[in-house]
Regions:
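The feature captures the beta-strand-to-loop junction immediately N-terminal to the Walker
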Residues: 33-38
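Helix-to-loop junction immediately C-terminal to a conserved catalytic motif
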Residues: 51
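Conserved ABC transporter NBD signature motif
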Residues: 59-67, 78-79
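Conserved ABC ATPase "signature" region
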Residues: 113-148
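Hydrophobic anchor residue at the start of the ABC signature
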Residues: 163
Length: 168
């Protein structure tokens, strides 16, 4: 079976500091995979390398059979990899549904022009994102919160909203 995500001898240095040293791992479809370690062990740095925020000092990252080493985060996201961050980064004065719909921005074709003038493309994209966002909220158990402002949610639910947005 082909791996969803694979790291081969990935290292990342900050000057002389070895934050990540020769990490090799393979995640198959359906796997539940955890990365554990003490503070400062390099876990976040490793995820930053995998998602394109940092370029590895050495090694290779492969996503769905395709090398993504050194690609910028937006290109990696377009290939289907998403992530959340340690600090919650929701739009606090938008609803849960609106926060999840924002996660679809890389999949829609609407431009600022089409949104401004409410073109056919805009309405098609709006319909698609609305339907899919509601589906995701239902799948992660957040549908009852869809009209709630993110700012009014407890921390744990806010984290789930971030995960739902990453799934978009």
């Amino acid at each position: 079976m082909a791996a969803i995500l694979e790291a081969r001898d990935v290292s990342h240095y900050f000057g002389g500091l070895k934050a990540v040293e020769k990490v090799t791992m393979r995640i198959e479809q359906g796997d539940i995979f955890g990365v554990i370690g003490p503070n400062g062990a390099g876990k976040t740095t490793f995820f930053n390398v995998c998602s394109g925020i940092y370029r590895p000092t050495s090694g290779e990252i492969i996503f769905r059979g395709e090398p993504i080493t050194g690609l910028p985060p937006e290109k990696i996201a377009r290939k289907g990899m998403a992530r959340t961050f340690q600090n919650i980064q929701l739009f606090k004065f938008m609803t849960v549904l609106e926060n999840v719909k924002i996660g679809f921005h890389i999949r829609t074709k609407s431009t600022m022009f089409s949104a401004l003038f409410r073109t056919k493309q805009y309405w098609q994209d709006e319909s698609f994102t609305q339907e899919k966002a509601i589906e995701i909220l239902d799948n992660v158990g957040l549908l009852t919160y869809k009209d709630t402002l993110a700012n009014n949610l407890p921390y744990g639910i806010q984290r789930k909203v971030e995960i739902a947005r990453a799934l978009a």
